[in-house]
Amino acid sequence: VRGCICPHPPLLIPEIGGASLARVEATVRGMQALAADLGEPETIVVLSPHTPSYADAHVVKVAARLTGDFGSFGCPQAAFTFDNDPALVDLLLALAGGDREVMLVPGEDDLLDHGVLVPLSFLRPQKLVSISIVNAYGEHRALGKLVRRCAEELGRDVVFVASGDLSHRLTPDAPAGYDPRGRSFDELVVRAAEAGDFASLSNLERGLVGGAGECGLRSFIALGGFLGDDATADPHVYSYEGPFGVGYLVARFGRPEGPAVA
């Protein structure tokens, strides 16, 4: 079983980042190393906090082909197209229908947001499944477990990508302003990633999470559900940095290469 944590700042796209790429060199190298370690998995499932959703229902895109570009960031020429995995999507929807812990509905649009596109500008899946988050943090672990169950039933080589940035309040000039809880939050998440300790992420104090101004914790909790007891098997943190007041973490869990499902 394999999964990873990926940041999603659009400035990682060279045409957008320009000279600023030099300030996120550790993140770029981390993503490149992650991509090399993962190889070309059969399917990548991405959970993005920026995918349009409902407050209480995850949305999984059902279009045969999924597309997106960075036009909203002034770079429409950076465009991507991926094949969906209809068998996995169909099974997710079918099993969610009988699972009271997961509310999952089909999404008809084929557009991918930057929370999906930035990680996928480095990674090389044969197929892509895109799922959104919901409001309640605690419900995401069950979603991850559902994805794991479906991958096992299909015998799929699935990599779960938890897309998300850490605190947006690390410095006085950060996008969301400064809050000292931001640094504390990031330190806790990085330590948890180093140990594969996803259980601790589900029990973080609510005030700390709110003060941090994060956008990745829900995705990380879902990844923990997907990995289960395998989370501690081979955790590896490639990089962490926050040069613009936002924390960027790149980490992998599970074997570097090989099928996610035996």
Which residue ranges define each predicted feature?
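Flexible, D/E/H-enriched segments
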Residues: 1-41, 53-145, 174-262
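Beta-strand elements within well-structured catalytic alpha/beta cores of enzymes
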Residues: 43-48, 156-164
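Catalytic metal-binding/acid-base residues of hydrolase active sites
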Residues: 50-52, 166-167
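Short, catalytically relevant binding-site loops at active-site mouths
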Residues: 136-137, 166-169
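Non-transmembrane, aqueous-exposed alpha-helical and coiled segments at domain scale
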Residues: 145-153, 158
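Short conserved catalytic/interaction loops centered on acidic-Pro-aromatic/His motifs
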Residues: 158, 169-173
